[in-house]
A protein has these predicted regions:
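SAM-dependent nucleic-acid methyltransferase catalytic core
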Residues: 134-238, 243-251
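Glycine-rich, phosphate-binding/catalytic loops in enzymes
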Residues: 62, 84-85, 228, 234, ...
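Phosphate/oxyanion-binding active-site loops and adjacent basic polyanion-contact surfaces
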Residues: 22, 26, 133, 192
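SAM-dependent methyltransferase catalytic-core segment centered on the flexible catalytic loop
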Residues: 242-274
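Non-catalytic nucleic-acid substrate-recognition regions in nucleic-acid-modifying enzymes
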Residues: 32, 36-40, 57, 61-62, ...
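Residue-level marker of regulatory loop/turn positions in helix-turn-helix DNA-binding domains and
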Residues: 22, 129, 229
Length: 274
C-alpha cells in the first residue's frame, strides 16, 4: 500500500471535501483496502479513530455499512454529518438561501461588529481571524441556528469548513500557524451559500446510497461504546492518532470555539487529553 498517493483526488472529492483535515488519509486508500480485503455490501467496517469520516463516507459510497468512533466533539460532529445524506435537496437549498438573505440583512444593519467573549478569544490563536470576517461569521452562525432547520448540521458544517479555509488567517504546513497575509474583508455569506450549493449537488448525486448504514459514536475507542456492534465487525480500516506528536485540538481550535464545541479553558484541557 506504500505506493498510494496521499492526497484527495478530484474524482473522490464529493462529500469528503465538505470538511477534512490536511493530514487525512485519502479516500482511494479506503477504496483499495475494500478491494484487497474483499469487503462487499454484506460486510460491516469499523474505524475506531474515524476523525472526519473518510473511511465511513467511502464505505457508504460503496453501499457498505460502517461504524466510526471519534473522541473529539467537533470531528464527531463532522463525520456524523457527512454520513447522513438528506434526500430533500430542494428544501435544503431553498432554506439556505433564506438564511443567507437574513444574515446579509443583519450584517448590513450592524452598528458595531460582533465579537467573541474574552474567554473565547483567549482560546484561539492570536490573529486567527480578522474583525469583519469574524463578525459576519457570528451573524451567519446565529442566523443558521435561528432558522431551526432540519438541515442545520449541514449548514454549520459548511460554515466550519470556510471558517478555516476562507475566512481565517490560518495556514497549515502541516502544523497550524498564522499567515502573514491577513483576510481583512470576506464575503462570508456568499462563500457559504456557494458551499451549500456544492453540497446539494453531492447529495443529489449520492442519494441512491443515502440509506446505507453508517453510525458515528462519540467516545474513546479504548472503552468501546455500543458494544452490540462489536460482533458484527468484519474489517477495521483506520489511522491511529499520535497523541505524543500532535495536539489535534489546536488544528480545529478556531471553528470549535466559534461553533461552541469549546468555550472554556477547562473544556479545552479535556479535549487535549485525547
Amino acid at each position: 500500500m506504500g505506493n498510494v498517493e496521499n492526497k484527495l483526488r478530484v474524482e473522490d472529492s464529493s462529500i469528503h471535501d465538505w470538511y477534512r483535515f490536511v493530514l487525512s488519509f485519502p479516500p482511494h486508500l479506503v477504496q483499495q483496502y475494500l478491494e484487497t480485503f474483499c469487503v462487499d455490501q454484506t460486510s460491516f467496517v469499523l474505524d475506531p479513530f474515524c476523525g472526519t469520516g473518510t473511511t465511513n463516507v467511502e464505505c457508504k459510497k460503496h453501499g457498505v455499512s460502517s461504524w466510526g468512533i471519534e473522541a473529539s466533539p467537533l470531528t464527531h460532529f463532522v463525520s456524523k454529518t457527512k454520513c447522513v445524506w438528506a434526500n430533500d435537496t430542494f428544501n435544503f437549498l431553498n432554506t439556505a438561501k433564506q438564511i443567507a438573505l437574513a444574515a446579509a440583512r443583519t450584517i448590513n444593519s450592524l452598528s458595531k461588529p460582533r465579537t467573541l467573549s474574552e474567554e473565547q478569544t483567549s482560546l484561539i490563536l492570536k490573529n486567527s481571524i480578522c474583525e469583519q470576517p469574524l463578525s459576519s461569521t457570528l451573524v451567519l452562525r446565529d442566523s443558521i441556528r435561528a432558522a431551526n432547520s432540519p438541515f442545520e448540521d449541514y449548514y454549520l458544517l459548511a460554515l466550519a469548513k470556510h471558517i478555516v479555509y476562507s475566512y481565517s488567517n490560518l495556514k497549515f504546513g502541516p502544523e497550524v500557524g498564522i499567515s502573514r497575509k491577513k483576510k481583512e474583508s470576506v464575503d462570508v455569506v456568499e462563500i457559504w451559500l456557494s458551499e451549500i450549493e456544492r453540497m446539494e449537488t453531492d447529495l443529489e448525486y449520492w442519494k441512491h446510497h443515502s440509506s446505507t448504514f453508517a453510525d458515528i459514536s462519540l467516545g474513546d475507542a479504548r472503552s468501546i461504546p455500543k458494544r452490540d456492534y462489536i460482533g458484527k465487525v468484519d474489517c477495521v480500516i483506520t489511522s491511529p492518532p499520535y497523541p505524543n506528536e500532535k495536539d489535534y485540538s489546536r488544528t480545529t481550535r478556531l471553528e470549535s470555539v466559534i461553533l461552541g464545541f469549546i468555550n472554556t479553558k477547562a473544556l479545552l484541557l479535556h479535549h487535549q487529553l485525547f
